[in-house]
Amino acid sequence: MKTSLQIAAEARLEPIAAIAERLGLPVRYLEPYGRYRGKIDLTFLDDYHDRPLGRYVLVSAITPTPLGEGKTTTAIGLAMALNRIGKRAAVTLRQSSLGPVFGIKGGGAGGGYSQIVPLVESILHLNGDIHAVSQAHNQLAALTDNSWYHGNPLDIDPDRIEIRRVVDVNDRFLRQVMIGLGGKQNGFPRQTGFDISVASELMAILAMVNGVGARAALRDLRSRIGRMVVAFRRDGTPITAEDVRGAGAATVLMREALKPNLMQTIENTPALIHAGPFANIAQGNSSILADLIALRCADYVVTEAGFGVDIGAEKFFNLKCRASGLWPDVAVIVATIRALKAHSGKYDIVAGKPLPPALLHENPDDVISGGANLRRQIENLHQFKVPVIVALNAYPEDTPAEIDAVAHIATTAGAAGMAVSNVYAAGSAGGVDLARLVIEIAERPGPRPVQFLYPLEWSLADKITTIAHRIYGAAAVTFSPTAAAQLAALEDAGFGNLPICMAKTHLSLSHDPALRGAPEGFTFPIREVRLSAGAGFILPIAGTTVTMPGLGAHPAAHQIDIDDEGNIVGLF
């Protein structure tokens, strides 16, 4: 089979105005960026606020291996398959970060015959939103240090300057740095660090902005940026972006980034690509604004939540849906037989290395053993009172006995059904069974109850403990002395009513990536707690999770090059 990059190069793209028409978006709301990309004017939401909403489909996954299980590919393929069988459908996705593209996981744009095109443009810069977020964030960091330097009128405690710099690169050497060296003309020395750009609170804010129209969304963006806590005074009170007089400039820098990007799939299905917060260190979902626009246009909107149900989907419900007022009609869990076997604990899948040969041999018993993870993730979704479908992302080595084992797990765990998806190799034709099952479940009559995991009035510690116990399966939660003090200070400062955005590994239901399947009886450790007042959540950090990834021994960047004709090679 051809590489994803080769397949993308052969795609027959339609002009972006034609994609807007397919979506049902009047062309006057389209701002083209070349022939095949565009942004959507938010005044569409003002003018079409009374259009009925389409069906809302969430795509999540079991706990993935380091290679990923094809969740984005499945989401794209499902939207294409829905279009194929007569439904007007669109997919909403996060924008790719350059860190994973040049690291190891890939670009988050799907693959094979189920991907976003033009591929290179979609994963390299797109329309400049991540640059805008990075620039706005670093401007706020500079203004914070500048206020401290010029007489410190806000009484900034230099040991509690919370905002770090950001860059869209995986670089472990930037996690801890000293700045302000070389004499007073260069500032004052202090220890700080860099995060990857998509871990910026501004990226989380971009994804959480809500509003019934352009002005309302801009006001919400400006207000949220103004509430960002960048430092603390010596008396312990917070200092905001508004206090350092940086909120206005940051909003100006992000003004165009507020508009969702319009792209297309390889079969010309509309794709709204907007915001890119990581799921393991932020909320891991595309923007509310993109979903609202798509739902006012399409019969079906397929959206993807990062990593497994325990991370992206939990945050989708407790953070995104709580803010948007939207609720999905059905949820899809993507699983692969290789990942289920890996969750049996008998196989090691290591990024950048060949799969263990035994993993490719038929073994339905190992599928059943590792199926504990699928069961737990189905149970996790049921806590939100949403019907669940399992999509088995097929590989050539899958056998009928192993597929039957997955179907048995799904049925006995209470899933509404299972469908085999082969969209990577066959495009929309490989997703028709899944699309028909989604329609059947989504259009069943009956109530659609809204069920969050916890009420906001609970204490921060109780909300954290509830997630760890009910979603991860933890027996207990421990808080380091630092985390306990931070929680107390946040509650004293009036932030106790915010929801929780847990930062933890995506490779396990627990905090420990070595614990596979559905671990129980473990203690979940919270080492520190951060405040994202602008985004509107508390960020507890568990285990060894870091907000600046590093590169592996063999990063993808080693394989990427360009030939004399200007063709990119090695990207996928």
Swiss-Prot record:
Repeat keyword on record: no
UniProt keywords, alphabetically: ATP-binding, Ligase, Nucleotide-binding, One-carbon metabolism
PROSITE patterns cross-referenced by the UniProt entry: FTHFS_1, FTHFS_2
GO BP of this protein: tetrahydrofolate interconversion
Cleaved signal peptide residues: none
Catalysed conversion reaction: (6S)-5,6,7,8-tetrahydrofolate + formate + ATP = (6R)-10-formyltetrahydrofolate + ADP + phosphate
GO MF: ATP binding; formate-tetrahydrofolate ligase activity; methenyltetrahydrofolate cyclohydrolase activity; methylenetetrahydrofolate dehydrogenase (NADP+) activity
Positions of ATP binding: 65-72
GO annotation, cellular component aspect: cytosol
Pathway info: One-carbon metabolism; tetrahydrofolate interconversion
Record-linked InterPro entries: Formate_THF_ligase, Formate_THF_ligase_CS, P-loop_NTPase
TM regions (residue ranges): none
Enzyme Commission code(s) on record: 6.3.4.3
NCBIfam families in the cross-refs: PRK13505.1
Family membership noted in the UniProt record: Belongs to the formate--tetrahydrofolate ligase family.
Name of this chain's protein: Formate--tetrahydrofolate ligase
